[in-house]
Curated annotation (Swiss-Prot):
<dbReference type="Pfam" id="PF08031">
    <property type="entry name" value="BBE"/>
</dbReference>
<dbReference type="GO" id="GO:0005576">
    <property type="term" value="C:extracellular region"/>
</dbReference>
<protein>
    <recommendedName>
        <fullName>Berberine bridge enzyme-like 25</fullName>
        <ecNumber>1.1.1.-</ecNumber>
    </recommendedName>
</protein>
<comment type="similarity">
    <text>Belongs to the oxygen-dependent FAD-linked oxidoreductase family.</text>
</comment>
<dbReference type="GO" id="GO:0009505">
    <property type="term" value="C:plant-type cell wall"/>
</dbReference>
<keyword id="KW-0560">Oxidoreductase</keyword>
<dbReference type="InterPro" id="IPR016169">
    <property type="entry name" value="FAD-bd_PCMH_sub2"/>
</dbReference>
<feature type="modified residue" description="Pros-8alpha-FAD histidine">
    <location>
        <position position="119"/>
    </location>
</feature>
<keyword id="KW-0274">FAD</keyword>
<keyword id="KW-0547">Nucleotide-binding</keyword>
<dbReference type="Pfam" id="PF01565">
    <property type="entry name" value="FAD_binding_4"/>
</dbReference>
<feature type="disulfide bond">
    <location>
        <begin position="40"/>
        <end position="104"/>
    </location>
</feature>
<keyword id="KW-1015">Disulfide bond</keyword>
<dbReference type="InterPro" id="IPR036318">
    <property type="entry name" value="FAD-bd_PCMH-like_sf"/>
</dbReference>
<dbReference type="InterPro" id="IPR012951">
    <property type="entry name" value="BBE"/>
</dbReference>
<feature type="glycosylation site" description="N-linked (GlcNAc...) asparagine">
    <location>
        <position position="61"/>
    </location>
</feature>
<keyword id="KW-0732">Signal</keyword>
Length: 542
């Protein structure tokens, strides 16, 4: 696969006949570029495609173009009128179309972005703020999934969602699962490039820890698999973040065993019920040391009106087993929570996906909702940040955190426990380095609606909360999760040679010492920095 054969050229007559049947050229500089790109695509692929279903421009039909652009973009903050828009959008329907896209973009010197599910926190998969003009390669039509229960594996294309993958696994077996994220609308292509954690992480590690093979298009338009790309590049794409080394076409993943019966629960406590922080402090002490089968997160939200606002803590758990065994574990290790049999709900693994996703639970939607690529929280404007705690946060620190939370109405903080399998995998196994010694990960999240008159006030607040937490989290470097991308940490400037110096700071936040190896691999496989964005891995300075 490493040495792709030259693709046959379609005759000029057939190219232009097909082209003009779907597209009318307007003599402007932008459409001239579109014209050149389309003709180049046809010359470099032998798999036909129709322009009206794959190629979208504001000149042809502005409303359809906008609909396609916004279709999977999850952060509305990057769809405002002032944000740059792609000159056109191309939706490949075959892997050779992706190869041709790379070849033609390189030949015509077109900067592009690649989107699978549109969940990038800072929108870099569909917006370029540093290089304009740009175009968008949207992989949403590449979503085939082939599950092989006998081989305990599956091939899944980059445009498929996590929800679709889970559904197709459950369709074949009730005893198999996969340890990826909890939100069903996540695009599998980009999700795994950042590591990808979920409710099975303490038992089986990350999604990226369970990748067996991959197909990728490199900077020369070649189609590579694990054998032809080599182990260095295969290492880099499993957690080194997307948009740096090539375009992921598909992953071969390892399925993991799950029991026929899982148990889930939610126990909610208000600040008034845990004013001394006895329960929360105990969670900090034991959450990463519980049995590997138990995954117990804490969600902090603000409830009540102005006169009666309080912080609510929802302890949301999943146990790989029946509720009787879970009750024994909780009575032994975390009696302070007060879990009861009534709190526990037994269900299948696929039903637990619906439960953990945040969809309504009374009644829950049918599992077919996983095929609809719907986000349970909808599409909102938001800003997110992340941290890693290496030790329990003292009561004084918790008091200050709660005080900051009460300043807002739509604030969300999530604590995710580590330990288990995460402790057993070395930091350098893949680029994702947050392993042994991590008690829990923290996500800070603030959303708002399009009617918000002062969005800058919301982003200012989350930055203040992040600043307040500084003494209580990791340092030197202050670690961050790359799938919760945060441009506050720093960003590249155009295609500048100075990017490496500045990137060492945010690179250490995301990857610790693994950043240096990522840069060496990037410099080898993409020396011209063809694949780039605001936080892509830079090349070594010449």
């Amino acid at each position: 696969m490493g040495n792709s054969k030259p693709l046959p050229t379609i005759s000029c007559i057939s190219v232009f006949a097909l082209y003009f049947s779907f597209y009318t050229i307007t003599l402007t500089s932008s459409t001239s570029l579109q014209d050149d790109f389309i003709k180049c695509l046809y010359r470099n692929t032998n798999v036909r495609f129709t322009l009206d279903k794959t190629f979208f421009t504001p000149e042809r039909n502005a409303s359809i173009f906008t609909e396609v652009l916004e279709s999977t973009a999850q952060n509305q903050r990057y769809l405002t009128k002032t944000m740059p828009k792609p000159g056109f959008i191309f939706k490949p329907v075959h892997e050779s179309h992706v190869q041709a896209s790379v070849i033609c973009s390189k030949k015509l010197e077109i900067h592009f972005r690649v989107r699978s599910g549109g969940h990038d926190y800072e929108g870099v998969s569909y917006v370029s703020q540093i290089e304009k003009p740009f175009v968008l390669i949207d992989l949403s039509k590449l979503r085939q999934i082939n599950v092989d229960i006998k081989d305990t594996s599956a091939w899944v294309e980059a445009g498929a969602t996590v929800g679709e993958l889970y559904y197709r696994i459950a369709e074949k077996s009730k005893f198999h699962g996969f340890p990826a994220g909890v939100y069903p609308s996540l695009g599998i292509g980009g999700h795994i490039t950042g590591g990808a954690y979920g409710s099975l992480m303490r038992k089986y590690g990350l999604a990226a820890d369970n990748v067996l093979d991959a197909k990728i298009v490199d900077a020369n338009g070649k189609l590579l698999d694990r054998a032809s790309m080599g182990e260095d590049l295969f290492w880099a794409i499993r957690g080194g973040s997307g948009g740096s080394f090539g375009i992921i076409l598909s992953w071969k993943i390892k399925l993991v065993p799950v029991p026929e019966t899982l148990t889930v629960f939610t126990v909610t406590k208000t600040f008034e019920q845990d004013r001394s922080f006895k329960i929360l402090s105990k969670w900090q002490e034991i959450a990463d040391n519980l049995v590997d089968e138990l995954f117990l997160r804490v969600f902090f939200t603000v409830s009540g009106n102005k006169a009666n606002k309080t912080v609510t803590m929802a302890y949301i758990g999943q146990f790989l087993g029946e509720k009787g065994t879970l009750m024994e574990v909780m009575k032994k290790d975390f009696p302070e929570l007060g879990l009861t049999q009534k709190d526990c709900i037994e269900m299948s693994w696929i039903d637990s996906i619906i439960y953990n996703s945040g969809f309504p639970t009374n009644p829950p939607p049918p599992i077919e909702i996983l095929l609809q690529a719907k986000s349970p929280i909808g599409k909102v404007y938001f800003k997110g940040k992340s941290d890693f705690a290496k030790k329990p946060i003292p009561v004084l620190g918790l008091e200050g955190m709660f005080k900051k939370l009460l300043e807002e109405d739509a604030a969300l903080v999530i604590w995710t426990p580590y330990g288990g399998k995460m402790d057993k995998i070395p930091e350098s196994e893949i680029p994702f380095p947050h392993r042994n010694g991590t008690n829990f990960m923290i996500q800070y999240y603030r959303s708002w609606s399009d009617s918000e008159k002062r969005p800058n006030r919301r982003t200012k607040w989350i930055r203040e909360l992040y600043g307040y937490m500084t003494p209580y989290v990791s340092s030197n470097p202050r670690q961050a999760y790359v799938n919760y991308r945060d441009l506050d940490l720093g960003q590249n400037k155009d295609n500048s040679k100075s990017n490496f110096i500045e990137a060492k700071i945010w690179g250490a936040n995301y990857f610790k010492d693994n950043f240096n190896r990522l840069v060496r691999i990037k410099s080898k496989v993409d020396p011209d920095n063809f694949f780039r964005h605001e936080q892509s891995i830079p090349t070594l300075p010449v």
